[in-house]
């Protein structure tokens, strides 16, 4: 914030600096999005947003008719958890709360069984906490495709964490008949959306919940799918602690997504 105040121009403004929770921030963002000019192109840097805030932002853009034409920018990570060895990677620890994301409540009917869908990332503990909280009748775990990953190193780490999570689930012996897996793109949100949609087409009559835990680009894809299919709920697991000293180092390229 100090950098912003030092370098800001007269028309620049800081939104949400006094907010103490996500609902207050969403209200402030809604006022800003509502005022976006239709004569100017909106460019949003999503790099440092939480998965929850990113999904809310997309919901607001859609609600106020500003989604089409908006450009999302994302600086991919060169390395995650750069203050640890590759075998000790951690991005967050613990889960404070699990909640549905504002704008994506879904349609949850008591008469239907629950289907939890997790595009898996590096945070196995968060995924385990979500599975334990929801106790779904059906569980789908997504793994990023090698050819649709940011880098081979990211794919290898992600694949290792995917196997850890699947091994945990297998050991519980709760989903022997109802566990399924799918692959998805980590670099193209439209592909991600279609990958998840194709997988979900195999199921019907369920309360579907998606918990995006991979990179922000795939979260965009999940949110876009849920805008098309509003019966799907999006959930977010809020960590107790982030690896603030070594979460990620910036890569040397920026992904631009034209919505």
Question: What are the residue ranges of the model-derived segments?
Answer:
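Long, low-complexity, Lys/Arg-enriched
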Residues: 1-42, 49-259
């Amino acid at each position: 914030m100090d950098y912003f105040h030092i370098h800001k121009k007269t028309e620049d403004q800081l939104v949400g600096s006094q907010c103490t929770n996500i609902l207050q921030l969403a209200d402030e963002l809604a006022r800003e999005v509502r005022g976006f000019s239709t004569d100017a192109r909106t460019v949003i840097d999503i790099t440092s947003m939480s998965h929850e805030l990113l999904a809310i932002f997309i919901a607001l853009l859609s609600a106020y008719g500003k989604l089409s034409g908006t450009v999302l920018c994302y600086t991919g990570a060169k390395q995650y958890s750069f203050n640890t060895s590759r075998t000790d990677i951690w991005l967050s620890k613990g889960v404070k709360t699990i909640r549905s994301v504002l704008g994506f409540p879904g349609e949850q009917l008591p008469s239907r069984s629950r289907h939890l869908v997790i595009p898996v990332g590096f945070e196995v503990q968060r995924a385990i906490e979500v599975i334990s909280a929801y106790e779904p009748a059906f569980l789908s775990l997504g793994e990023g495709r090698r050819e649709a990953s940011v880098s081979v190193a990211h794919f290898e780490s992600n694949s290792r964490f995917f196997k850890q999570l699947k091994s945990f689930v297998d050991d519980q012996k709760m989903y022997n008949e109802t566990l399924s897996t799918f692959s998805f793109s980590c670099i193209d949100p439209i592909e991600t959306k279609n990958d998840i949609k194709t997988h979900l087409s195999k199921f019907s009559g369920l309360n579907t919940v998606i918990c995006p835990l991979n990179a922000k680009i795939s979260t965009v894809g999940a949110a876009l799918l849920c805008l098309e299919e509003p019966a799907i709920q999006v959930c977010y697991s809020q960590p107790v602690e982030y690896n603030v000293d070594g979460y990620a180092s910036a890569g040397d390229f920026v992904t631009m997504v034209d919505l």
